[in-house]
Amino acid sequence: MLEIYEVIPAQEMQNKQTQLTVELRFDERQKSRHKTQTTCGKDLGWFIERGYVLAHGEGLQSKCGEIITVVAAKESVSEVTAENTHQLMRAAYHLGNRHVPLQVDPTKLAYLHDHVLDDMVRGLGLTVTAAQAPFTPESGAYHGTTGHGGGHSHSHGHSHDHHHDHSH
């Protein structure tokens, strides 16, 4: 099994030659520890920084030096379009208020398919279309990155004792 402890940012992957890919759903890309297989059937497991979300185009570097390209798998998503920007912003506000992972593109929003959310968004006057597409939501304001993922992890799969005396 290929053991992964390092993530290579997508920008750096443009200069790398890789032969292995792994296709992952959003829920898999959020895991700090996960076992799966490459698209050609090679076993791999990663041990990366907790809270890190793998992004489409990033690389996973194995302990033995092999590099695997991360591909965002197609998933059931709801795509939201509107007649104007104001409507789209209102939908983003209401979905964000429900803490829904949200992909924000210039002319549409997308979230993992949920018929209750679809009904809410339609009730706001927007168009919701079911689709099969890669899902790359915003990483959030507190993750230290902008846009759809990014960053760099050098987690090495070890833990530290964080025992603190908290006497008051």
From Swiss-Prot:
CDD domains the record matches: UreE
> Where in or outside the cell is it found?
Cytoplasm
Renumbered to this chain, region (Disordered) spans 137-168
Keyword annotations for this protein? Chaperone, Cytoplasm, Nickel, Nickel insertion
- Major location, coarse class? cytoplasm
**Which Gene Ontology molecular function entries are recorded, alphabetically?**
nickel cation binding; unfolded protein binding
Question: What this chain does, per the record?
Answer: Involved in urease metallocenter assembly. Binds nickel. Probably functions as a nickel donor during metallocenter assembly.
- Biological process per Gene Ontology, one example term: protein-containing complex assembly
Gene encoding this polypeptide? ureE
Q: Which Pfam families match?
A: UreE_C (PF05194), UreE_N (PF02814)
Annotated family: Belongs to the UreE family.
Gene Ontology CC terms: cytoplasm
Protein's name according to its UniProt entry: Urease accessory protein UreE
Q: Where is the composition biased (Basic residues)?
A: 151-161
